């Protein structure tokens, strides 16, 4: 298991990577970050919250379709309930709330989960 510092560094990099990917898509999403979380607000007013949970060594995603807890397993962040990787989960929940297909997150988190 990696050190606390490297875990926090990888989470910082993950949050920045999510923001960077959102900047690349042509969807009007307001992104606010701080206090260990990202809040994505859509035109409809709905939100997705991506938050770090260092005590559990997890990333949590809260969306209209539910709450998802992801843990690192080998080279990926995996959802405990759906089995989805972080990139697949983010593509799905952002697509659902944006009302159009989004594939911006493919591969995100895999390189940072090692």
Where are the regions that the model predicts?
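N-terminal intrinsically disordered, cationic/polar leader segments
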Residues: 1-114
